[in-house]
Each structure stands twice: as structure tokens, then as C-alpha cells.
């Protein structure tokens, strides 16, 4: 019994015969080629298994190429902002020069009166300087907001490149001298790096290192904060590292066995002498353009077997 309101369509006899004919032909074709189809499937499975590594390498290379495009966008945004800022500064400077030319300069003055005049001018400059600092800070914050979409997109793409940050840090000309083989293994579990800067009430640089599960420590995120001034980065706060019991003794030994500046000492001891140098490299160089230090893997040549020791490209 059909539901109320349903429609019925009767297929003409000649079409039904045609369908049956096609069905019988298809069935015969399938039966006739069963063995051939099985062999084809086996060959396809073998080819698919052999090509997994090549496909993964291609995906990683595609992600790296996409990073190239994103970094170009970030640089364009930054360049546009800098040019606009420079043009604004030039315009304000020219206005100040014109205003200065319109005001007659002081006549001959005694040293005492000159110092008094100098003090008066300096007092007038203070609010102007404060206004300039605020304007520069607002401009910088505006630039950071405009860069954020590209930076977020860059971070998402980096997730598709296994070991990206370990590769970048280990190949930085200054950082490479501070990293041991054990440091590299620890860094291989690092999945992301983020840097945030705050200007108010103080200039603060926050470094966040994200890790997946590893045999060294339990932390998923380790945060290090630095107060920034004209001359240095000064340690402010760091997340305590929760070492696993099996590695805690080794961590203590490493920290006290080598008193020189290295990545492990910076990582495990926030107040280690010279650690501000590593913080500055991460904030001012690696974070802004990590791709320039990434060593790309040469894709395997056609017809050759892939191996874990593929040659690196500079």
C-alpha cells in the first residue's frame, strides 16, 4: 500500500529491457575480469603503500610553500604600516620646521637666561614627547592587529610540517651553537611557538612553547616572560617545569654539570646568566620570519627508494 500523495512512474517496456540487457552485459564483464581486477587491486595497494612517504613529503613541502606566501603577506602589511608611519613623521617634522621658521629666534642671551629658556623649552617638549610615544604605541598595536590573521594562518600551516620549530631553532646560526643532541630530541616534541608583546603598562615580551606528550616533562605549555627596555630583555616570570621522575635526576645533573649558556639551561632555569640573549633571538628574529632558517628536505627522485636520511636543502 503506497503512502497517500505518493507518485508512481511506470518504466516503459523497451527501457526495462534495455536496463536488463545492460545489467547482463555488466555482470558478464565483471565475471570475466574477476581475476584481472584482483590483480589490479593488489598492484594498487602495493603502489599506495610505496607512495605514502612521498605523499607525506609532498604535503609537507606544500605547507612550506604556503608559509612562503603567508610570510610575504606579513611583510607587505608591516612594510605598508612602516611607510605610512614614516610619511606621517616626515609630515609632522616639516610642519614643525615651518612653525619654527615663522617664530623669530631669541636675541643675544646670557648663560643664565639661556639655561632658563632651555628649561622652559624642555617643559614644553614633555607633553609633545608623551603624545609621540602614545601615537607610536597606537600605531604599533594597529600594525599587530593587521598582522594577526596572517600570523594565525601561519601557525595553522606550520602544524602540517612535522618538526618545523625544532628544525628552525637548530639551524639558526646563533642557536645551533647552544643546542645539544638531547636538546634537539626534546625540541622534536615541540608543536608550536607563539610570541606576544604588551606595551602597557610596561613593555613585556611573552614566549610560549607548546609541546605534545614526551618522556621528559608533563607541561603542555611553557611560558617565559621578559621585561623589555632599550638595552636588554630582563627575566620576569617562567612556568616551572614538571619533570617526570625518570628524568628529574638527569635534568638536575645537566643543569649543574654545564654552567655555560645553552638551550637546556635557558629552558630549565629562567634566571640563568645570559638567557636574555636566547629570548631576544626568539622574539626579534625567529618569530618574525622562521622560514628563513628552515632546511627543506629534497624530494625523492622518481624511481629511487626513500629513506629517513633524505638530503637537506639550504
UniProtKB/Swiss-Prot annotation:
Keyword match Transmembrane helix: no
GO BP: cell differentiation; gonadal mesoderm development; nucleosome assembly; spermatogenesis
Keyword Cytoplasm: yes
Main location: cytoplasm
InterPro entries: NAP-like_sf, NAP_family
Subcellular location(s) of the protein: Cytoplasm; Nucleus
Keywords (A to Z) from UniProt: Cytoplasm, Developmental protein, Differentiation, Gonadal differentiation, Nucleus, Spermatogenesis
Molecular function GO labels: chromatin binding; histone binding
Pfam families: NAP
Source organism, top-level taxon: Eukaryota
Gene Ontology cellular component terms for the protein in this record: chromatin; cytoplasm; nucleus
Function: May be involved in sperm differentiation and proliferation.
Family according to the record: Belongs to the nucleosome assembly protein (NAP) family.
Protein name (database record): Testis-specific Y-encoded protein 9
Native species: Homo sapiens
Lineage: Eukaryota, Metazoa, Chordata, Craniata, Vertebrata
Gene name of this polypeptide: TSPY9
Amino acid at each position: 500500500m503506497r503512502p497517500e500523495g505518493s507518485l508512481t512512474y511506470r518504466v516503459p517496456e523497451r527501457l526495462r529491457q534495455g536496463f536488463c540487457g545492460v545489467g547482463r552485459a555488466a555482470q558478464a564483464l565483471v565475471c570475466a575480469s574477476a581475476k584481472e581486477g584482483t590483480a589490479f587491486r593488489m598492484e594498487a595497494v602495493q603502489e599506495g603503500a610505496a607512495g605514502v612517504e612521498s605523499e607525506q613529503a609532498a604535503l609537507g613541502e606544500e605547507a612550506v610553500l604556503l608559509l612562503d606566501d603567508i610570510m610575504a603577506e606579513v611583510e607587505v602589511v608591516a612594510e605598508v604600516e612602516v611607510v605610512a608611519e614614516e610619511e606621517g613623521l616626515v609630515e609632522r617634522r616639516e610642519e614643525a620646521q615651518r612653525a619654527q621658521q615663522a617664530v623669530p629666534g631669541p636675541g643675544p642671551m646670557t648663560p643664565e637666561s639661556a639655561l632658563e629658556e632651555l628649561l622652559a623649552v624642555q617643559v614644553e617638549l614633555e607633553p609633545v614627547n608623551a603624545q609621540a610615544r602614545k601615537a607610536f604605541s597606537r600605531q604599533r598595536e594597529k600594525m599587530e592587529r593587521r598582522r594577526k590573521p596572517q600570523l594565525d594562518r601561519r601557525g595553522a600551516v606550520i602544524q602540517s610540517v612535522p618538526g618545523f620549530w625544532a628544525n628552525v631553532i637548530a639551524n639558526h646560526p646563533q642557536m645551533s651553537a647552544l643546542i645539544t643532541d638531547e636538546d634537539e630530541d626534546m625540541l622534536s616534541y615541540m608543536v608550536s611557538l607563539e610570541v606576544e608583546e604588551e606595551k602597557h603598562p610596561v613593555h613585556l615580551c611573552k614566549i610560549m612553547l607548546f609541546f605534545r606528550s614526551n618522556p621528559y616533562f608533563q607541561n603542555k605549555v611553557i611560558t617565559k616572560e621578559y621585561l623589555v627596555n632599550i638595552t636588554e630583555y630582563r627575566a620576569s616570570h617562567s612556568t616551572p617545569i614538571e619533570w617526570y621522575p625518570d628524568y628529574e635526576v638527569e635534568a638536575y645533573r645537566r643543569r649543574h654539570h654545564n654552567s655555560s649558556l645553552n638551550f637546556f639551561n635557558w629552558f630549565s632555569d629562567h634566571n640563568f646568566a645570559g638567557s636574555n640573549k636566547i629570548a631576544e633571538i626568539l622574539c626579534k628574529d625567529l618569530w618574525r620570519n622562521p622560514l628563513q632558517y628552515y632546511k627543506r628536505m629534497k624530494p625523492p627522485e622518481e624511481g629511487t627508494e626513500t629513506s629517513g636520511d633524505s638530503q637537506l636543502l639550504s
